[in-house]
From Swiss-Prot:
Membrane-crossing segments per the record: 31-51, 58-78, 133-153
Family (UniProt): To M.jannaschii MJ0554 and MJ0587.
Signal peptide: none
GO CC annotations on file: plasma membrane
Native organism: Methanocaldococcus jannaschii (strain ATCC 43067 / DSM 2661 / JAL-1 / JCM 10045 / NBRC 100440) (Methanococcus jannaschii)
Name of the protein described by the UniProt record: Uncharacterized protein MJ0129
Keywords in alphabetical order: Cell membrane, Membrane, Transmembrane, Transmembrane helix
InterPro entries: DUF5418 (IPR035582)
Location of this chain's protein in the cell: Cell membrane
Bilayer topology annotation: Multi-pass membrane protein
């Protein structure tokens, strides 16, 4: 298994034209993995607390989420430091292209998490019904927060695309 990962990584790096683009791509995948894992842990703690409030204390929820956030932000700062260093070697066009790709992947990842969380809540509601108003409030809160985050990502994406078009015209 490890040899497969190493070989695929080497092939990936060899295929990349620019060494710095290869480094950025690998760092981007690491950042996405950290963010995805953290979101999954946080959402699973929240969903577990929603359906089993008697089995978990509020202190445990807070401690779990804060631990994840401390780990997440520490690792993200570390990885973004590498990203900043590698971005300094690229042209402006390549920088915006990288940011565009990164934004698309984050958008799709967060959308997947939102749909998975909502489907888990709906499936649990079918099996073990909670009061209807609680169910509607849970789904509504998740939906509103997802819509806000998605609008922010779309705005970011549109800004990056405008910059890319401006650079292409020059």
């Amino acid at each position: 298994m490890l040899s497969f990962v190493v070989m695929s990584f080497l092939i990936f790096v060899i295929v990349m034209v620019n060494e710095h683009k290869a480094h950025l791509s690998v760092i981007q995948k690491m950042i996405l993995a950290v963010v995805n894992g953290s979101i999954t842990i946080i959402l699973s703690i929240i969903v577990f607390y929603i359906f089993y409030p008697q089995n978990i204390s509020l202190f445990l929820i807070t401690a779990g989420i804060l631990t994840v956030f401390v780990f997440l932000y520490g690792l993200l700062l570390f990885l973004f430091g590498f990203t900043h260093r590698e971005l300094s070697y690229l042209s402006k066009y390549d920088k915006y292209k990288f940011l565009c790709k990164f934004t698309i992947e984050m958008f799709s990842s967060l959308t997947n998490h939102a749909f998975l969380t909502i489907s888990a809540i709906v499936l649990y509601q079918i099996q073990h019904p909670k009061p209807t108003i609680d169910f509607i409030v849970m789904i509504g809160m998740i939906t509103i927060s997802v819509i806000v985050v998605m609008l922010l990502f779309l705005k970011t994406y549109s800004i990056i695309i405008k910059q890319l078009k401006k650079l292409e015209n020059n």
